[in-house]
Amino acid sequence: MKNIKGFKVAVALYTVLVTASCSTSPKGDGTLTFVESNENALTVCHFDQVKNTININLSELVEDLKIIRFENTDNAFFKSCNLCITDHYIGIRQSESLPFLLFDHNGKLKCQVGAIGNGPGEYSQTIYDEAINEKTGEIYLSFFFSLPKVLVYNTDGKFVREIVTKEKLSKPKVEVDDNGDITIIHMPFTYNKEKFLATVYNKNGLFKQELKPTPNFLQENFNQDIFAYHNVPEFSFWLSSCDTLFHYDKNANKIYPKFKMDFGKMSETPLHIYNELPGYYLTAMLWDKGIIAVNKEKQTSNYARLINDFFGHMEAPMFNFSNGWFYQMFEPGRLITQIEKRLTDSDCSAEDRKQLETMLESIDEEGNNILFMGKLKQKGK
């Protein structure tokens, strides 16, 4: 989709959702404009206006840094596809043929969640999203395609129940409230009998509500993707066919467009992905073309590099925020390589050097993975 069309779709959809909207003049550093109403504001970042690059310290975004060394028992070794971190747990999504694993913050394997197979509580499809809710003591797994359900387990890995939906789910994203309500957003297809963009079930699996899709959300094939990183209180998501980041308001049963990158009249829109943090909108330009960080409060936009000032001032991945946590997973050999590279930098201070060398000496190259993680600060903290 050409971006100018995507921009028109976003603005057109917004004018349907709200009334008395108006486009404001640029604010902040001039890279942003806003489409505003009494109940919402759509932030538009103009790609051709973003020129500068800044460093952001990790300590500005997270409360502290934890370094987790996962245990070296045979059952605990893994290759991570994705992870879900909470205050006490680390959930590891593996490949299609391997089960979900649950660790504690000491890196100890607590359990395997369910099992691979086709029996009750088993799964053979790729996990597409997961949620761990410590209030309910449950783990929720959703799957890539064609299953009309979300599987629920306890934190001992035992199957508890399934949430059965009205329609087969396609690339579903899930969030669970403290009261156990589960919200599901997925890609609706034109051929679905029961078309919904979002749906909510209570903790017992009883249907509560759904939001029907407008035509621009309906899909003909699997060429698009849906993303949700679960870093803010609202259900923040974006569907690549619309190229706008939305919030789903469960209480109002509405969606609101919140952020859009305007690429102007470029003949080909650069491949990109959106993420949202409490204080930033992030746009990852794929193929190592940088991360654009929009500061919500200052109303500024810059290319951004993330610096891990907790650990040797090593550069860290700016986009690695999910479920309210920063994460950076290393195989031991890769961490050794990055530390050695940092030690050759001319700006590596004596203090940083000591910290890095101490860590380097402690790494078992044949050991399990090592995780750097930190909980996101919430807005105003």
Predicted stretch roles:
Residues T19-S21:
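C-terminal motif of bacterial Sec signal peptides marking the signal peptidase cleavage site
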Residues G28-I67:
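Blade/loop signatures of beta-propeller domains
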Residues L42-V44, H88-Q94, G137-F144, G180-N192, ...:
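Short beta-strand elements that form the blades of beta-propeller/WD-repeat-like
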Residues E71-S80, P99, F103, K108-T136:
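Blade-loop segments of beta-propeller domains
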Residues T73-A76, G114-E122, V164-K171, T214-Q219, ...:
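Short coil/turn segments at the loop-to-beta-strand junctions that recur within blades
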Residues F78-N82, S124-E130, K168-D177, L218-F227, ...:
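Repeated scaffold domains used in trafficking and secretory/extracellular systems
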Residues S124-I127, F144-E194, L211-T214:
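Asp-box/WD-like beta-propeller blade repeats and closely related beta-sheet repeat scaffolds
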Residues Y256-Y274, K298-N323, I336:
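Conserved blade-ending motifs and adjacent loop-strand segments that build the rim/top face
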